[in-house]
């Protein structure tokens, strides 16, 4: 079979192993790295990858051939935890952060998430759409081709639905594919202060059924943290969501360890998020339950904390992990996944291969798109990120610079040398 598109002579092509499950523990150390590699694409899907001169059978009279000496290729990068859609911004809290005021104290003062809730409730669909599109454009220019996006800045049905409608519209309109997560349990809204269980009952009885009926989200998430929702409250919400057919996520062990990872393990959550304060016992439980750890080192960086999620302990225990931005207006105002990848090396001591596996094949499993993206297996969508680097180590070593040369989405060139095309 001849290719429509043949990308040749890469210095290296990074090929994650899709073993039929996320890469656990030591499996994350392994990948195929093709020297003088090529990628053949047919009808927007991967036809073949290899080293050296492509087989003549791949080349027909209409095959477009492009050479990439001095470049590397990876599967399209996947940002599997973001709070993409929101109103306003929170630079007015930056001075407090610099002065050492803790995140939960800012929240208790009516700032933090609640500040963004007020701005998001006031924002129109058009305003939220335009703001989120700009973030997606930035992500695409940095090599990202799939993004998970949560609601959670409405905390009422009208605004939560507006956020999810924006995600759905952008999924249709933008080159980046989006995966929706419903997270009305991001905080207790001011009108339910002191009545968190009553608010969760509202979510369970009124919001979740409508989200499912209107097919607005695939995942359900909750913030299990001191001063927000307890482990028992998280168990209540997520068990009800599971009964309705949602896949589960949980923000856990970010600031204190209060049992969120136990809930993740008990309910078979797809992933647990943050995990900076994860204990050895919690890590063991997640490993046994095959819960993916979505790690967000840029949040630790932004909060100016010293404790990063114990990635090496997790791998030694046999967990699967990802790296992702947590892009949001407060605790992590960035949309640069390449920077997050570099933090994975510099602050978590992950190797380049482990990092690249974390943002490709494991991230694909985290968003339930492993059959479509995350590796260069034949038949998967031809999402390809091309970096201006001579080997796979270089973009992790040469930090704080966007090295994206080109991006292909389903075999279509969508980024070319700093421009969206």
UniProtKB/Swiss-Prot annotation:
**Pfam families linked:** Amidohydro_1
* GO molecular function term, any single one: iron ion binding
Q: How is the cofactor bound?
A: Binds 1 zinc or iron ion per subunit.
Q: What class of enzyme is it?
A: hydrolase
Q: Where does Zn(2+) bind?
A: 81, 83, 251, 326
Keywords carried by this UniProt record: Cytoplasm, Histidine metabolism, Hydrolase, Iron, Metal-binding, Zinc
Q: Where in the cell is it found?
A: Cytoplasm
Q: Which CDD domains match?
A: Imidazolone-5PH (cd01296)
Q: Name one GO cellular component term.
A: cytoplasm
A single Gene Ontology biological process assigned to it is: L-histidine catabolic process to glutamate and formamide
- Residues holding 4-imidazolone-5-propanoate: 90, 153, 186, 254, 331
Q: Which cofactor does it need?
A: Zn(2+); Fe(3+)
Q: Which pathway is this protein assigned to?
A: Amino-acid degradation; L-histidine degradation into L-glutamate; N-formimidoyl-L-glutamate from L-histidine: step 3/3
Top-level taxon: Bacteria
Q: Which residues bind N-formimidoyl-L-glutamate?
A: 153, 328, 330
Reaction catalysed?
4-imidazolone-5-propanoate + H2O = N-formimidoyl-L-glutamate
- This entry's Enzyme Commission designation comes to 3.5.2.7
Q: Which residues bind Fe(3+)?
A: 81, 83, 251, 326
Q: Which HAMAP family does the entry link to?
A: HutI (MF_00372)
NCBIfam families named in the record: hutI (TIGR01224)
The family annotation for this protein states: Belongs to the metallo-dependent hydrolases superfamily. HutI family.
Please give the function described in this protein's UniProt entry. Answer: Catalyzes the hydrolytic cleavage of the carbon-nitrogen bond in imidazolone-5-propanoate to yield N-formimidoyl-L-glutamate. It is the third step in the universal histidine degradation pathway.
Q: What is this protein called?
A: Imidazolonepropionase
Q: Which organism is it from?
A: Streptococcus gordonii (strain Challis / ATCC 35105 / BCRC 15272 / CH1 / DL1 / V288)
Query: What's the gene?
Result: hutI
